[in-house]
């Protein structure tokens, strides 16, 4: 029996190889990106948690939030996510996720505690370099722009997309084995 492995894919003619190309792709000036990267850790506000919640979430502020939206619209919009990935994917939600699990013999509902803060900057840089095939300098800059204090900030516009991609090498085979 052969396994059918379906991976996420980046539908783009050419990977981003330098800061000028990144600036063009995001329709921003290079200096804006570089300045925002330097200030990124201090460009978030902590979101007050709902009563009873223990999750620490953050919202990007000012130009960093603009950059996050552009990354979502100009880069993540070109990622084709497999059907088994539902979270934060356009036109997919908890309803479509529930439909996929209707009539299954086993249904497991789990939440990985502190998943976002456990995803380190090195993991994110690997996504930018290996999955997207961006150059190392571009990957480092994007990592600075999309992490807070060295990890993935839960609540940021880009974080769920990156969380979906951080296991891009391993998750497809696991999904195929589980059938």
Residue ranges and their predicted role:
Residues 35, 84-88, 140-142:
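Short coil/turn segments at secondary-structure boundaries
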């Amino acid at each position: 029996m052969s396994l059918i492995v379906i991976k996420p894919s980046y539908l783009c003619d050419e990977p981003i190889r330098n800061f000028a190309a990144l600036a063009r792709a995001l329709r921003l000036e290079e200096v804006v990106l570089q300045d925002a990267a330097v200030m990124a850790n201090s460009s978030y506000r902590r979101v007050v948690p709902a009563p009873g919640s223990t999750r620490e979430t953050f919202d990007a502020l000012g130009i960093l939030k603009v950059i996050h939206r552009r990354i979502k619209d100009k880069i993540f919009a070109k990622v084709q996510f497999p059907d088994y990935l539902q979270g934060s994917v356009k036109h997919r939600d908890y309803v479509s996720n529930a439909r996929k699990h209707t009539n299954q013999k086993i249904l497991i509902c789990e939440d990985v505690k502190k998943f976002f803060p456990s995803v380190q900057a090195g993991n994110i840089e690997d996504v930018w370099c290996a999955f997207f095939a961006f150059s190392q300098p571009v990957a480092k800059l994007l990592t600075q722009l999309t992490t807070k204090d060295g990890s993935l900030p839960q609540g940021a516009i880009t974080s769920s997309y990156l969380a979906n991609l951080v296991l891009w090498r391993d998750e497809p085979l696991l999904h195929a084995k589980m059938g």
